[in-house]
């Protein structure tokens, strides 16, 4: 099945003006997205895919999101938006808002006055965006993108991702399960491009395209290349960069790249557009899993479609660490606040495999963290009130923060920080467990020199068993998530919270929940005041807060000791009963059986007695032997 690009983008909302208003209602419908299997997907106003949105810098966005599900909450996050002064519009349940209950409507209302470039939006609830609740979001730099720093002829959006043939709720029940003790992530069935497979992109010769590529998947990073065509990277995650030419991109989930592609003058041949799984992220590779997906760059649709394109090596992809921002912003000063977090994956006492930062798996509070900030007064400066299982750090206004992430896990992790772009000032190499290498934590006295002009973006990958250092300024008051964007790992709890300049949040009217936001809370019966335990009379009393399951204890517990004791007693009693049975007299029915078989009971007994280490002596008569056994039993 080949789908032309124009069919995949017909649902783009491309309007210009001061305010853009959208009314979206969630629902379910059956679609055959990958051309192989029909399955339920999340629809928008009964349609699928969700609309891609294109606006201009300075425009206002109004999205009325109605939850059309019968029994499931929902939410909407505009990925990469700074939301300066409008933290309540960031769309994270139990962090910046209450979940939107069935039948309810929430208005997301904000202005895009700082962001430009390539973004996307998605549900931030229970992995729903893997079921299709997502779309691309482009903010042009001035009307018709007139302030974009590079020349091009046409602007094209491409979303890439993986696709499952089963809904996320079913997969999650199997994933977060004691029968999956290693935490093996569900394996996707296919790779998709613009919500389909075998896409055709018809191009004009000698034309420069601005190609915006967004990985809207929830798990696997992808390699992306176009046969016999170079790509010039000009933007990453909304940050303009100096041109950097490459033949291949490595794109983690949630990352965005804008590249310039110049087409050929010759129209005699069509070319392959290639996607490839990063199969190192898969615990197992099923025999029927196709690791590559082929779409088509078409100069002449009357010509044959190309075969899939192979490359000599997938290691020759662009390393985004070395990209240079066009604004050439220098390395921020030495950090005022250093936060070190260690990534581990482990099991808790319920047998389920979880993800941890510093041995804490993120557990939602009873009161959304932003509402705790707004109701806590000066106590908002103390991270304790936000709960012992939210991994919350309080940042002072304007301080430079170093976020050191040590990966004790053997897998890659793409990390995303809400409300900011950060400078990636260090990313160590992979340390390969298969080669016997151990996890390598950051060493402040022994590391590579930081770049003078670091790369900036909002989503970056961390190598296996490695470390990285992200530096950013606490210049955007709000409650911001930092989390792994592998959706399975977020469901496992791989997240921390940054409460940034809480007193400024309290003193800014636009940071307070609207009447609609408070009504949403009331409808799902979520408290709007108090600490993580919903205690609004004593913010330092966390009794009743949500907490993670207990760790698996080391050594023997009381239950284990008792179980072992009774097991040993049962074993001793069992051996004793066997011995007693062995020395008991032969029942008359058994003697009759022996005689019917022409066996002498005395001979059988003599052989049995001579082989027993317990017997006192061999007997010459059956009666003597019986008497000995009776005495033994009596004893």
From Swiss-Prot:
Membrane topology listed for this record: Single-pass type I membrane protein
Full protein name: Iron transport multicopper oxidase FET3
Residue numbers binding Cu cation 4: 413, 484, 489
A molecular-function term among this protein's GO annotations: ferroxidase activity
GO terms (BP aspect): arsenate ion transmembrane transport; cellular response to iron ion starvation; intracellular copper ion homeostasis; reductive iron assimilation; response to copper ion
Secretion signal span: 1-17
Glycan attachment points: 70, 73, 109, 194, 198, 244, 265, 292, 359, 443, 535
TM ranges: 560-580
UniProt keyword Repeat, yes or no: yes
Species this chain originates from: Candida glabrata (strain ATCC 2001 / BCRC 20586 / JCM 3761 / NBRC 0622 / NRRL Y-65 / CBS 138)
One Gene Ontology CC term in the entry: fungal biofilm matrix
PROSITE patterns: MULTICOPPER_OXIDASE1, MULTICOPPER_OXIDASE2
Binding-site list for Cu cation 2: 79, 122, 485
Binding site for Cu cation 1: 77, 416
InterPro entries linked: Cu-oxidase-like_N, Cu-oxidase_2nd, Cu-oxidase_C, Cu-oxidase_fam, Cu_oxidase_CS, Cu_oxidase_Cu_BS, Cupredoxin, CuRO_2_Fet3-like
Cofactor(s) named in the record: Cu cation
Topology Cytoplasmic: residue spans: 581-628
């Amino acid at each position: 099945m080949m789908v032309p690009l124009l069919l995949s983008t017909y649902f783009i909302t491309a309007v210009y003006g001061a305010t853009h208003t959208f009314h979206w209602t969630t629902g379910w419908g059956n679609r055959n997205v990958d051309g192989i299997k029909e399955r339920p997907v999340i629809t928008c106003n009964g349609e699928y895919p969700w609309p891609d949105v294109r606006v201009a810098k300075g425009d206002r966005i109004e999205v009325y999101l109605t939850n059309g599900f019968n029994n499931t909450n929902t939410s909407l996050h505009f990925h990469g938006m700074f939301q300066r002064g409008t933290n309540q519009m960031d769309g994270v349940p139990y962090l910046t808002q209450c979940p939107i209950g069935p039948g309810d409507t929430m208005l997301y209302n904000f202005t895009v006055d700082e962001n430009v470039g390539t973004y996307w939006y998605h549900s931030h609830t229970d992995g729903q965006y893997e079921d299709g609740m997502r779309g691309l979001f482009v903010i042009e730099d001035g009307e018709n993108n007139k302030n974009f720093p590079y020349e091009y002829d046409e602007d094209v959006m491409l979303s890439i991702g993986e696709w499952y043939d089963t809904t996320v709720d079913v997969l999650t029940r199997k994933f977060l399960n004691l029968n999956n003790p290693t935490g093996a992530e569900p394996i996707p069935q296919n790779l998709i491009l613009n919500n389909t497979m075998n896409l055709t992109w018809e191009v004009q010769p000698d034309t420069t395209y601005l190609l915006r590529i967004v990985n809207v998947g929830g798990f696997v990073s992808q390699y992306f290349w176009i046969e016999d065509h170079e790509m010039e990277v000009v933007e990453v995650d909304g940050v303009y960069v100096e041109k950097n030419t490459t033949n291949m991109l490595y794109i983690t989930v949630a990352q965005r790249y804008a590249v310039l592609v110049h087409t050929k003058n010759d129209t005699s041949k069509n070319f392959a557009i290639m996607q490839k799984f990063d199969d190192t992220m898969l615990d197992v590779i099923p025999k029927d899993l196709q690791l590559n997906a082929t779409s088509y760059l078409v100069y002449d649709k009357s010509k044959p479609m190309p075969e899939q394109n192979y490359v000599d090596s997938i290691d020759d992809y662009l390393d985004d660490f070395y990209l240079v921002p066009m604004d050439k912003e220098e390395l921020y000063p030495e950090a005022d606040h250093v936060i070190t977090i260690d990534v581990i994956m482990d099991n808790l006492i319920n047998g389920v495999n979880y993800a941890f930062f510093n041995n804490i798996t993120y557990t939602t509070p009873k009161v959304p963290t932003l509402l705790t900030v707004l109701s806590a007064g000066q106590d908002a400066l103390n991270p304790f009130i936000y709960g012992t299982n939210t991994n919350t750090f309080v940042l002072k206004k304007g301080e430079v923060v170093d976020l050191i992430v040590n990966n004790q896990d053997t897998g890659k992790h793409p990390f995303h920080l809400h409300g900011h772009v950060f400078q990636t000032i260090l990313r160590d190499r992979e340390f390969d467990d298969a080669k016997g290498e151990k996890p390598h934590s950051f060493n402040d006295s022994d590391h590579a020199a930081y770049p003078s002009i670091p790369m900036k973006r909002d989503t970056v990958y961390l190598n296996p068993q490695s470390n990285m250092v992200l530096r950013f300024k606490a210049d955007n008051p709000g409650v911001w998530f930092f989390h792994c964007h592998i959706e399975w790992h977020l469901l496992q709890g791989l997240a921390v919270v940054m409460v940034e300049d809480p007193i400024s949040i309290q003193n800014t009217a636009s940071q307070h929940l609207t009447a609609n936001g408070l009504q949403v809370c009331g409808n799902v019966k979520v408290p709007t005041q108090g600490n993580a335990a919903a205690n609004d009379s004593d913010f330092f009393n966390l009794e009743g807060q949500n907490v993670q399951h207990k760790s698996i204890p080391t050594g023997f517990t009381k239950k284990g000791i008792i179980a072992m004791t009774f097991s040993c007693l049962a074993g001793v009693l069992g051996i004793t009963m066997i011995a007693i049975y062995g020395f008991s007299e032969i029942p008359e029915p058994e003697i009759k059986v022996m005689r019917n078989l022409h066996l002498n009971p005395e001979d059988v007994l003599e052989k049995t007695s001579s082989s027993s280490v317990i017997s006192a002596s061999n007997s010459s008569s059956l009666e003597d032997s019986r008497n000995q056994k009776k005495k033994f039993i009596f004893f």
